[in-house]
Amino acid sequence: MEEKYLLAEELKEERNYQRRPHICGLFFFLNKGEINMKYSESLKKYHDFQKVYKAGKSYGNKYLVMYVVENQKNCNRLGISVSKKVGNSVVRHRLTRLIRESYRLKEEKFQCGYDIIVIARVGAKEKSYFDIESALIHLGHLHNIIYE
């Protein structure tokens, strides 16, 4: 029993050692000597979404709509919205995961300091990862928030 407790304490210490706060939008893993890509936060609060909807500029394509507004931080905040019109919970969650993964893998191309909301349209329901990724990159280019 005592051995399990010590193991749990060691794991907690290791986790605390691995994750450090982001500096200038970067996230570090110190134990492996690797630098992970930029660190983004999520938009979760209703009033944060409302600020972006009211003050932000929007562009859309066949599959996605993107609202963007500058924030006063050194990292991006991403919010994803998938309406019930798109499909049942399995479909909505799949689209959310595709959008989040597309953003995560292309995150280094996006400029820092923006609140971004991505809304999935009904046409995105049956699309592949590559279609969603290209739609997201296209909208980033329209907003001029992607490095060339």
Report the location of each language-model feature:
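Positively charged, solvent-exposed patches that mediate nucleic-acid binding
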Residues: 1-148
